Amino acid sequence: MLLLFAVMLTALFEMQLPHHPYNTLPALPPTQDLETATLLKAVAQAARALGELKGVCQTLPNPALLINTIALQESKASSAIENIITTHDELYQAIVQDLDIMLASGTISPSAKEVLRYREALYEGYNELQKRNLLTTNLFIRLMQTIKQNSAGIRKESGVCIKNQMTGEIVYTPPEGEDVIRQKLYELEQFINDPPHDLNPIICMALLHYQFEAIHPFADGNGRTGRILMVLYLVQQGYLDLPILFVSAYIIKNKARYYELLRAVTEREAWQEWCLFMAKAVEETAQLTLHTIQRIRIAQDDIT
């Protein structure tokens, strides 16, 4: 009985309390066995869809058109997750005209500007990978600065917390202290670029996305930066040649479940459920991107 009480007391102290900074956030990978039969099946289906997408992209006569179209859709959806809403017409108009002139004249909204900055950050990350196939803290900062158009760096202030938008209840408090945050990011870099494991990269993509969001290194722009990192990681690992996975489409369609599972990993280490969700996101959005390519090809054929 005494032993049971001691175990329960230990578990209570180890539990992450929502209003306490999560400075004890463990480094990746998790200690539990992730490669169950169910998850490996889901990962295989996601990998198959990515392989088909990669193969089709290699046959495109004008991949730049595809990159522009998909990147714009991903930018719009990822920004919508943060309640930044705009229209495709406004975005395409800004592409063919001078964005800064349109903004100064009031002919484009600040929301559209933020969406286009996301696309710019996606391109910037992809171009950096072509030069140096590494995902680093400095790159994370550059992506956020491009999205937010500021010179902010790692979050220094304390008291940052995530609240339920409906109730105001604190649901999560990320790590505090610049040194602590930088150490967490360094550990994440090591997991990404020099992994001491043989986990499937699609599982790793799910893990690193949670970890980045849990570290919450910036005052703003964490969600969008984290979603760019997922796509860049798949490029780094050779699953994609181009940054064209429309993953935010699945997340926005399942937004409540996405945030519920992020919280579940923190509260009860629900890694299996989280990784299954993300594997399904990869599979469905790879198929969605394939359908988009088919529509682009039909449109090109009609023009020619």
Task: Please name every model-derived segment.
Residues 1-304:
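FIC/Doc superfamily catalytic core
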